[in-house]
């Protein structure tokens, strides 16, 4: 049994009987942190829990995906997409990498939803109050004005109540927002499957400030490939690099992120910044033998 599966089963064991019985067939060895709208409705009917109660009850399962070797502080988040599907997320840390590269649970859940094709988030449930960094990150979303935040033992509040007089994309003249469907039409002639996958990600990236359209693809020792696209933020620092989004993709797919063996990064050369150096250093900390292909378009 993997460490993740052990954590999931420990979380299951602490749930009310009716919910545990209904969840057990879902939380199997293939579970990748997504609960469909229909599954959620079925769980709610079987458990007789309210929408809020059920989301809060599921948080320990989301936190089971946490990778926290530095803090040993496990945070879970559940983002509900506009489709009604629920996406788990958890904080991620890396040994020997500066702390600015860590991923917060809210960022993880939202990135997970983005990877799965969601175009907005209606609510997010978290087991600890969102830090200022995450409040600003969420303010970039297409649905920032209507996004609701649920904490344990608290009434649901809007993001704007957590971030009064907020600064966001509209203050910089940007319409849309993070998770808006995009296709930038970047092109690259290459025989490399990893570069092609990274190009697909770059074409979905959100980079209206630096214009560094960028994406990455990671190949793991298992042979599976995971991708990530850049999620830029109006406040700059809360931006989430493409590598971090790809690591969320891998982690929520039950991969050990230390088993990345090769990667490919694609960037638009017209961008004001580059992710190349920090991507190289972070990948080398995960696996010193990793290979990295790079294309600046």
Curated annotation (Swiss-Prot):
Keyword flag Zinc: yes
Domain CMP/dCMP-type deaminase: 50-170, 189-297
Pfam families xref list: dCMP_cyt_deam_1, dCMP_cyt_deam_2
EC number(s) on file: 3.5.4.5
Gene Ontology cellular component annotations, sorted alphabetically: cytosol
GO terms for biological process, alphabetical: cytidine deamination
Binding site for substrate: 91-93
Cofactor note: Binds 1 zinc ion.
InterPro entries (UniProt xref): APOBEC/CMP_deaminase_Zn-bd (IPR016192), CMP_dCMP_dom (IPR002125), Cyd/dCyd_deaminase_Zn-bd (IPR013171), Cyt/Deoxycyt_deaminase (IPR050202), Cyt_deam_dimer (IPR006263), Cytidine_deaminase-like (IPR016193), Cytidine_deaminase_bacteria (IPR020797)
Membrane-traversing stretches: none
EC top class named in words: hydrolase
Active site: 106 (proton donor)
Binding site for Zn(2+): 104, 131, 134
Cofactor: Zn(2+)
Record keywords, A-Z: Hydrolase, Metal-binding, Zinc
One Gene Ontology term of the molecular function aspect: identical protein binding
Catalytic activity field: cytidine + H2O + H(+) = uridine + NH4(+); 2'-deoxycytidine + H2O + H(+) = 2'-deoxyuridine + NH4(+)
Subunit structure: Homodimer.
Protein's job: This enzyme scavenges exogenous and endogenous cytidine and 2'-deoxycytidine for UMP synthesis.
NCBIfam families in the cross-refs: cyt_deam_dimer, PRK09027.1
Identification of the protein by name: Cytidine deaminase
């Amino acid at each position: 049994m993997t460490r993740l599966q052990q954590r999931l089963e420990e979380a299951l064991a602490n749930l009310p009987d009716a919910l545990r019985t209904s969840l057990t067939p879902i939380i199997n060895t293939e579970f990748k942190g997504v609960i469909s709208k229909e599954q959620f409705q079925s769980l709610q009917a079987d458990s007789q829990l309210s929408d809020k109660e059920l989301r809060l009850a599921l948080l320990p399962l989301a936190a089971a995906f946490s990778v926290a070797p530095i803090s040993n502080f496990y945070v879970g988040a559940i983002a509900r997409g506009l489709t009604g599907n629920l996406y788990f997320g958890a904080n991620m840390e890396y040994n020997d990498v500066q702390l600015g590269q860590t991923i917060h649970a809210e960022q993880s859940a939202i990135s997970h939803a983005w990877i799965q094709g969601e175009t907005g988030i209606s609510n997010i449930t978290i087991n600890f109050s969102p830090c200022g960094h995450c409040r600003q990150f969420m303010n970039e979303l297409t649905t920032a004005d209507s996004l609701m935040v649920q904490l344990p033992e608290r009434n649901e509040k809007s993001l704007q109540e957590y971030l009064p007089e907020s600064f966001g994309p509209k203050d910089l003249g940007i319409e849309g927002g993070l998770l808006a469907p995009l296709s930038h039409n970047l092109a690259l002639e290459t025989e490399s499957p990893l570069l092609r996958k990274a190009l697909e990600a770059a074409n979905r990236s959100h980079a209206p400030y630096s214009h560094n359209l960028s994406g990455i693809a990671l190949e793991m020792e298992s042979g599976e490939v995971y991708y990530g696209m850049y999620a830029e933020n109006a406040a700059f620092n809360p931006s989430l690099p493409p590598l971090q989004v790809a690591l969320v993709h891998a982690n929520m797919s039950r991969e050990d992120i230390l088993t990345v063996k090769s990667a490919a990064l694609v960037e638009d050369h017209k961008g004001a910044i580059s992710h190349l150096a920090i991507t190289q250093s972070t990948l080398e900390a995960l696996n010193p033998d990793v290979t990295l292909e790079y294309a600046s378009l």
